[in-house]
């Protein structure tokens, strides 16, 4: 869960805890004490399993995002104190008119779902730290200058002296904090980079394009992972004026333009069909995430060849001999 802190009148931390999966928390402080609650946009667990995921504001010196509640007196009896991270959206104005406190926690919510998928198959996993940078000033650009919000696009970035995820937040242009598939897609790239291996060239790509096989695999993998983590094969990405437009596609769709190993749609449809348990008339394999995770973090990561669909699927067929014909 996220970190919840009790602060005294001087801003010092007098108690700290973490929320459970439902957002519940418990803190013990002295009676009749002035207290302010602060919720930090971070999920941290030391030991095994372990992880450290933090949302920061790249336009504010990478300050950790947090929600600060109102001050209250702890009294002499147990209290229930609920905090709400507001979206900042005013329906009547069709605009954000106040602080967008919910954004960082919406991002962490998708990270949480993605993490659960990993823990289901790797319950003792120790996952490398990840910093997720989000700001309402983050906008599409042609250059990368995160200090002022120029992040090109929502992306998992390795280079420019950074290694982490950057998320768009520009109102009426492109906001991605609530686009769970987009966040999970980039988390898939994090998994490739930190738990496995990627030889992707990066750069521009579309779901219909003929691509370098390394790029096609990386993007197709992350599309498929997003559907697995979110639990929905319909990929959705909102954008535009009042965030009213959307780009969508179904990763389970096997009718693909430019079908082949050089096409990310081909890759994501194959991987998702291996994973899912829904027989759609094309696939009958329901292997779940385990074999795919094992492959991504072992033989695919160690291949002497460049990473592509060919460095994962053949070994999956070896591990799933009863499904070889279905995979083909």
Predicted regions and their residues:
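Zn2+-dependent metallopeptidase catalytic core
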Residues: 28-30, 49, 85-134
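Short pre-active-site segment immediately N-terminal to the catalytic Zn-binding motif
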Residues: 167-183
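Short, acidic Ser/Thr/Gly-rich low-complexity loop/linker segments typical of extracellular
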Residues: 7-24
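Structured interaction patches on ligand/partner-binding surfaces of diverse proteins
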Residues: 44-86
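Catalytic zinc-binding patch centered on the HExxH motif and its immediate surroundings
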Residues: 133-164, 177-178
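Short Pro-Gly-centered beta-turn/loop motif in secreted/extracellular proteins
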Residues: 26-36
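Short, ordered, surface-exposed loop/turn motifs in non-cytosolic proteins
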Residues: 1-10, 32, 286
């Amino acid at each position: 869960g996220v970190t919840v802190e009790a602060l005294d009148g001087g801003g010092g931390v007098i108690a700290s805890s973490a929320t459970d999966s439902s957002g519940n928390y418990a803190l013990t402080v002295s009676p009749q004490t002035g207290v302010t609650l602060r919720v930090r946009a971070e999920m941290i667990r030391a030991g095994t399993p372990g992880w450290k995921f933090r949302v920061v504001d790249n336009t504010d010196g990478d300050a950790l995002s947090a929600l600060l509640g109102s001050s209250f007196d702890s009294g002499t009896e147990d209290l229930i104190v609920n905090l709400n991270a507001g979206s900042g959206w005013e329906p009547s104005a069709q605009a954000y008119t106040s602080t967008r406190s919910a954004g960082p926690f919406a991002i962490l919510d998708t990270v949480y779902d993605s993490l659960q998928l990993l823990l289901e198959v790797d319950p003792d996993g120790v996952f490398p730290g990840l910093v997720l940078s989000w700001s309402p000033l983050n906008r599409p650009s042609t250059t990368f200058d995160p200090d002022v919000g120029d992040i090109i696009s929502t992306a998992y970035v390795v280079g420019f002296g950074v290694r982490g995820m950057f998320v768009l937040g520009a109102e009426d242009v492109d906001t991605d904090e609530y686009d769970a598939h987009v966040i999970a897609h980039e988390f898939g790239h994090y998994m490739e980079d930190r738990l496995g291996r990627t030889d992707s060239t990066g750069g521009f790509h579309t779901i219909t394009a003929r691509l370098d096989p390394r790029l096609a695999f990386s993007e197709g993998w992350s599309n498929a992972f997003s559907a697995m983590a979110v639990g929905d094969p319909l990929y959705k990405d909102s954008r535009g004026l009042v965030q009213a437009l959307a780009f969508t596609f179904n990763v389970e769709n096997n009718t693909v333009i430019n079908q082949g190993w050089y096409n990310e749609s081909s890759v994501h449809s194959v991987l998702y069909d291996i994973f899912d348990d829904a027989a759609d008339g094309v696939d009958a394999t329901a292997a779940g995430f385990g074999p795919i995770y094992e492959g991504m973090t072992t033989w695919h990561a160690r291949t002497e060849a460049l990473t592509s669909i060919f460095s994962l699927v053949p070994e999956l067929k070896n591990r799933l001999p009863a499904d070889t014909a279905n995979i083909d």
